[in-house]
Amino acid sequence: MVLITCDLHIHTSASADGKCPVKDVIAKAKERGLDAISITDHDTTEGAKQALALKDPGIMIIPGIEVSTKQGHLLVLGTTKVFEQGKDVLETIREAKAEGCLTIVPHPYHRWRHAVGLHSPDALREADAIEVFNSRYYIGTANNRAAKFARKYHKPMTAGSDAHTCQFVGYGINIIDAEERTVPSILDAIRKGKIESRCKKTPIRTYTSQSFHNVVRKVRRQTSRLKPRRVR
């Protein structure tokens, strides 16, 4: 048996809203004393691939992705595959599990952040685990609701920093009791519920600022789609 300290939900600059290059994420994780991190960028595995390519002996990389499904976001760990966006979340969960990946529903009840739990309770039961602490949700109501659901249905509970900047890497730490210091062993331990969490909230000022910039980015994207085209 070996205890692994791990942040299971981290974004890099490969995400549209990520600010931190891969090498800096790794440096911060090592500074925080983590044994492993899972890089889960939005709908891309480029960040995870870059991290694996660095082959840093000081930290284990669990490749992953945060998939935008029809009902909301889904973490898929143990893969460099890019899963199709917009599909039904249950279909994506089953596809990922069939390929040996680990599925986690992140921030399942956060109303403004693509919360699968608000649209598909079946997905929470189908997934391998539920993220019951997300450091970027300052008010604890949604996290508490996720934990209550997980306990009721005996689902493994995970934490994640959901860091989009380097300074918050490690704000959601998991202590995983794995058989070996390998990615498959870590994922298997999570499936079996051999995991405990230690958490720290993102400061309210930072959370508010990040949320504001995300709203601005979405409005700009929507506005650009509505621009009239020239008729020639």
Name these PLM-found stretches:
Residues 34, 94-97:
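Secondary-structure boundary/capping motif
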Residues 26-43, 102-104:
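Divalent metal-dependent hydrolysis catalytic cores, especially in the metallo-beta-lactamase
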Residues 41, 107, 161:
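Glycine-rich, histidine-containing beta strand-loop boundary motifs that form or position
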Residues 1-18, 22-27, 46-50, 54-63, ...:
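Charged catalytic cores and adjacent phosphate/nucleic-acid-binding surfaces used
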Residues 3, 96-104, 108:
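Short beta-strand/loop segments at the ligand-binding rim of alpha/beta enzyme cores
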